[in-house]
């Protein structure tokens, strides 16, 4: 059964090679037969050796079969510094570990896919930096087991142009249609309020925080718990194989004196572009619930 599972995954990933310039949300980096705890340690070491800084890590949705590392690199920071504003969301990249059929899948958010989504028409100016990020991720995966290097997360990929203009359907939000959570009197006041409220715990827990040097930009990755949190919505939307573990955590971007988040109907759809309307209807309240949780740490 385990051998059959690996063969199926290889075939799914290999088909992505034929798509050429069409991109998918995730890359399967490697697969390992070792225990999750062992793979976690090896992954952490490999990422650092490949030039990444680990900003944070956590167990999404309190699921014992999953683990996420959030990383940053010099190239990612430089790209954001050159562009500022909403490109601050590109300051962090997620690496997901998932146990599926006794195999640990090590996957990550596709930096070229997200780069096109967050930089849009400006991505060509920073593409070389993200290609370096992609190459370094491949290097990190090379010592973690069977190297896969295949795209997944959608049956059909999207062109860079389509990703830059992406929305799920007519009437739904684009990348730039962010939710403005709170406007503070200043950037420093915003940082102080957000960080003091997160520290209180509850249904929001800080996974990482990263401030862009020489810019009034700070990105926070926040784990969401409670009855409307990750444990509620992730099992509903993450139903395909391989799993989209690197979808989480959700972010708040403090941009100057304003805290914003990507709209749930955009952020979820970008990570799960094949979601059917039937599945989307099952989480119809989730974008609003996420917004409420995020407001709880900004107001």
Where are the predicted features?
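Sec/Tat signal peptide C-region and signal peptidase I cleavage site
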Residues: 16-20
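Soluble non-cytosolic domains of exported or imported proteins
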Residues: 33-38, 128-131, 284
